């Protein structure tokens, strides 16, 4: 979705329009440097129209993070449900990484730009981690028929750490990502996921 074209006031999609415009800005500039006026300009509306839906810039950031976290969890749930019992976890993790690449701006805001911005942002990130961990433990259980609760929890934590690190590396395009190239990077992430989920792999 693009932010070209002026929207009539109070249209039902107007709030989402603000979130998407803000996400584009937060992904390319430090959020503390972005103003409500900047968001309004990007969304092609007035600052008053932004304040109609949000009390502050921080609330827009929180809503953007909350929307991404919900979509990320839903995507992982779908991947886990589709996972065949006994199949490898690498493909599931790389599929989630590919989805985040398709939603790069939102992923950048969630994993990079919003870090340390506010207590609410950190609380949202922690809540998301807890939810993702639950799904990753389910994924481990589907891939390994005989795994103890403790081992599934540890493996799930390992997958969560890998996912967060890989997502951050990908959206930043850091030295590791650039030196490997996209295909090799994704392949390495998949192989690591397999070793984490099943050390005997």
Region spans (language model):
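Amphipathic alpha-helical packing segments from all-alpha helical-bundle domains
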Residues: 70, 119-144, 153-157, 180-191
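Pre-recognition alpha-helix immediately N-terminal to the DNA-recognition helix
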Residues: 17-25, 71, 91, 95
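C-terminal peripheral helix-coil segments that are non-catalytic and often amphipathic
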Residues: 1-3, 98, 102, 134-142, ...
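Short secondary-structure transition hinges
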Residues: 98-137, 172
């Amino acid at each position: 979705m693009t932010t070209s074209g002026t929207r009539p006031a109070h249209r039902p999609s107007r709030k989402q329009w603000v979130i998407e415009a803000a996400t584009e800005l937060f992904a390319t500039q430090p959020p503390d440097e972005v103003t409500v006026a900047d968001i309004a300009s990007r969304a092609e509306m007035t600052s008053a129209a932004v304040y109609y839906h949000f009390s502050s810039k921080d609330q827009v950031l929180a809503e953007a993070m909350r929307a991404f976290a919900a979509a990320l969890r839903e995507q992982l749930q779908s991947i886990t449900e589709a996972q065949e019992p006994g199949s490898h976890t690498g493909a599931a993790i790389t599929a989630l990484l590919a989805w985040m690449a398709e939603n790069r701006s939102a992923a950048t805001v969630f994993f990079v730009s919003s870090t340390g911005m506010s207590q609410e942002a950190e609380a949202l990130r922690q809540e998301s981690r807890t939810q993702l961990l639950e799904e990753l433990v389910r994924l481990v259980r589907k891939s390994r028929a005989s795994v103890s609760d403790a081992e599934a929890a540890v493996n799930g934590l390992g997958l969560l750490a890998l996912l967060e690190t890989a997502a951050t590396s990908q959206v930043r395009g850091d030295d590791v990502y650039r030196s490997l190239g996209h295909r090799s990077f994704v392949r390495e992430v998949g192989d690591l996921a397999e070793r984490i989920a099943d050390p005997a792999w």
